[in-house]
C-alpha cells in the first residue's frame, strides 16, 4: 500500500478526542497533556510509516488502544506494591526492609496533617527533629548522643567531612569496601576532603600498622565493618577495643562504619555473630554509623551514635541540613526503635526481623498452605513443597543462608523464565526466581495476603 495512502488513513486529533475512553482522561491530566500524548503517538505512527515499518492502513481501534495505554502509563503510579517471593529479606531492588502496617497507619495519621517535627510542645518553641528518637537510640545502644541522616553513605560522608577534612584518616586496606551503586569508601573520603591513609594489606592488618601511621596530620581512625563480604583463611584484623584504646592514648577519634548495623543478636536463628551497635559503643568507638532499613528493620536512614562532643560538631555542620531526614522517615524511625524497648516486640512486629526469625518448620507450614491453595485451582502446574535457602540481602550476612521450604511450580507447556517474566507484569507483580526449570516461591518473604494474591493472579496467566 502506498505510504501517502497509509498516512491519509491516520485519524486526526479531533476524531481521536471524540473517543470516550480517551476523552475520560482529560479530567485527570487536562486537555493540554491529553493532546500531547495523542500527538506523540501519532508522530510515532507517522515515523513508522515513513520508515517502511507499516505497510497496511491504520487500524483505528488498535491506534486508540495504543493511545489509551500511553495515557494509563502517564496517570498510574510507576512505583507500586510488588510481592517478594524471592526469599531475599532485605532485597535492595525491592525496597529493603518493609514497614509494618501498624506503623504505616500511625505515619499516615501524622503525615496527613501537621506535626511537631521541629516543635517542642512542652516548652512552646522550636525543637529538634532528632528529639523524637535520639533518647531512644541512646537508651538502646548506650551512646551519649545520636542523630540520623538520609542513609548510611550520607552518615559516613558527614562524619568524615565534619571531623576529617584536610586531615588523614587511617583505614585498613582490607576495609576499603564497595557497596551497591559503586559507592566506595575511598571515593567518599575524597569527596569529604579527608586524606586516605591505607595501612596493612588486604588480608592482614596489625595494631602496629595503625601506630606507625599516626602523625600530626592524623584526624581519625576509621574502622569499616565488611558486612557485605568476608575474607577468610590467612587473615587478621584489629578489634575495635584495641583501636579505641589507641585512639584514647593518642587523642584521636575512632569511627566505626557498621554498614547494615544490628541491635539484636541473630545467632539463635542460625546466623553467625554480627557485631551489634551496643558492642561497638561498649568497646569504646567514638562514633558508630549504621543503616536504618537493613537489619534494624526500619526506614532508609543513616544513624550515628556515640560521644556527645562529636555529635555536637556533626549537628552543626552545613552538610547536616542537606542530608537531614524528612518527617516520614523520622516518624518511621521512632516507631521502629520503640519496638526494640522489648526485643520480643521487635521480633514479632518488625516484618524483616519476623522473617529472619521464622523457623524451617514455620516455612514448611506456610509452603504447604500455599500449595494447598494453588492445588484447589485448575492451574497448569505440578505443585510441590521443596527445601530451599533464603538470603538476608542488603549487604548483610554474605555467607549465611536461612534454611526453609518453598512452593515449587513446574510447567511443561511453557518455559520457566517466560512464566517468571509474565508474573512480573501482573496487576500486582510477583517477583520470584527460576531454578532448574522450576518456579520457586519462597514463602519466608510472603504474608498470608500475599499468598492469596499469588493464587488469584496465577489464574490470569
Residue ranges of model-derived segments:
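Conserved PLP-enzyme active-site core in the AAT-like
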Residues: 123-340, 375, 457
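Catalytic, metal-anchored helix/loop core of enzyme active sites in primary metabolism
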Residues: 91-92, 437, 454-455, 461
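Conserved C-terminal alpha-helix-loop-beta "cap" of PLP-dependent enzymes
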Residues: 360, 364-447, 453-454
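A short linear hydrophobic-aromatic micro-motif
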Residues: 78-79, 145-146, 290, 428-433
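Short Gly/Ser/Thr- and Asp/Glu-enriched loop/turn motifs at secondary-structure junctions
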Residues: 10-11, 83-87, 296-299, 402, ...
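Glycine-rich phosphate-binding segment of PLP-dependent enzymes
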Residues: 43, 85-86, 96-122
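Long amphipathic alpha-helical segments
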Residues: 1-72
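Structural motif of enzymes handling amino- and sulfur-group chemistry
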Residues: 309, 317-318, 325-376, 386-389, ...
